[in-house]
Amino acid sequence: MRFAGNGLTCQSCHLQAGTQQYGLPLAGVWGVFPQYIGRENEVRTLQERVNGCMERSMNGRALPVDGPEMKAIVTYVRYISEAQQVGRSLEGRGAPPLPLPARAADPERGREVFASTCASCHGEDGQGQRLEAAEAAEQGKRYQFPPLWGPDSYNDGAGMARTITAARFVHANMPVVSPGVV
């Protein structure tokens, strides 16, 4: 059964299978949950946080908390967190701070940067690069490079829909071949 409602996978945001520093890593996350989540103004479990991603970033449905898919995700997060100290947040968790510019955003300059730096992977229209059906089935994903907006991307409730979150992530991780250029 498919729970994601779009063409993204966990690795669309959590780079290198959730192990890349500043690539929204999941390594170490096991030891910081349960955790207060400001959006909900409540302490939430890791399973609840995963379902938040499923519903917003993946634009889909919540996983059954004790179902095989949730157990697999939680087991993987625990496995990649084993070397980390419980209760201690890791260096490189999230994306690094980015100073806010002292000027207004410039959409025309943004268009130029996108065309010269982003479009080669994400497409001129930002809809990503789809894989052929056989390759997609083999790799377990629909896209070589994910769409950045539209129906096969995250929804407006996702963290990446926040301009500062997206800017910090892009600045630290894009383009993939030369992070930090953008």
Give the positions of each predicted feature.
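C-terminal capping alpha-helices of c-type cytochrome domains
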Residues: 49-89, 181-182
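Second-shell loop/turn segments in exported
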Residues: 36-39, 59-63, 97-100, 153-156
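Solvent-exposed, acidic/flexible segments
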Residues: 3, 39-43, 63-66, 70, ...
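Non-transmembrane alpha-helical segments in soluble domains
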Residues: 51, 74, 78, 111, ...
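Short amphipathic alpha-helical interaction patches enriched in hydrophobic/aromatic residues
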Residues: 54-58, 152, 174, 178
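Electrostatic cytochrome c docking/interface patches
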Residues: 1-2, 82-114, 128-130, 178-179
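Gly/Gly-Pro-rich "capping" loops immediately C-terminal to redox-active cysteine motifs
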Residues: 2-49, 128-175
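The canonical Cys-X-X-Cys-His
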Residues: 7-18, 73, 110-126, 182
